[in-house]
Amino acid sequence: MKISILLPYKENFSSKYAGAVSLFVKDTTIYSRYKNSIKIFGHTTYKSKFLSNYINLDIKKSILQSNSKIYVDKFLEYEKYLPSDLIEIHNRPNYIKHLTKKNNAKLILYFHNDPLTMNGSKSLNERNELLNKTHKLVFNSKWSRSRFLQGFSKFEIEKDKLIVIYQSSKKVKINFNKKKKNYF
């Protein structure tokens, strides 16, 4: 199974100035059973990349066309020659419409922020379209999932279509029974 992860256009997948999405993708990729089948696509000018399976999409910026559209088109050029079975899109619901026109892979969209503030998921119609065009929608909290669901009746959506994956890939156990020592 070939898996491609498409980062947001301005996300740095580098140890310098990495954003929350890059850190999440790096951590989950390292622990994934599919890590050898994953390619991560992004656009950064920094040389030190987190992982060797990162592919930098060099694009020429344009004042006449959306740089995000140019970025997605560049990704689709790779997909033409080495098609993915599954594509993860992080935090860019507006990429979905463009990807579904030219691709047959299963799409999974991750929401790391409030869906109602993002281009491509602000309106109920846009969110309904995302439900129809994606295989899964993943949220980083129950709150962001509930924001996405605003305006839908609970019977309109398949329950297994929406999942919550918290941003921590390591579970830390805290012993609350351990008593603090009083030093005073």
Each PLM stretch: what is its role?
Residues 62-86:
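An amphipathic, basic-hydrophobic alpha-helix
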Residues 119-121, 149, 163-182:
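Acidic anion/phosphate-binding donor-loop and adjacent secondary structure
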Residues 134-161, 169-171:
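A short, active-site helix/loop in glycosyltransferases that binds the activated sugar's phosphate group
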Residues 89-95, 111:
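Short His-centered aromatic/hydrophobic patch
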Residues 27, 75-77, 120-139:
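Membrane-proximal helix-turn-helix segments that form the acceptor-binding/catalytic region
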Residues 46, 93-95, 143-145:
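Alpha-helix capping/helix-boundary segments
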Residues 7-15, 24-67:
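N-terminal strand-loop element at the rim of the active site
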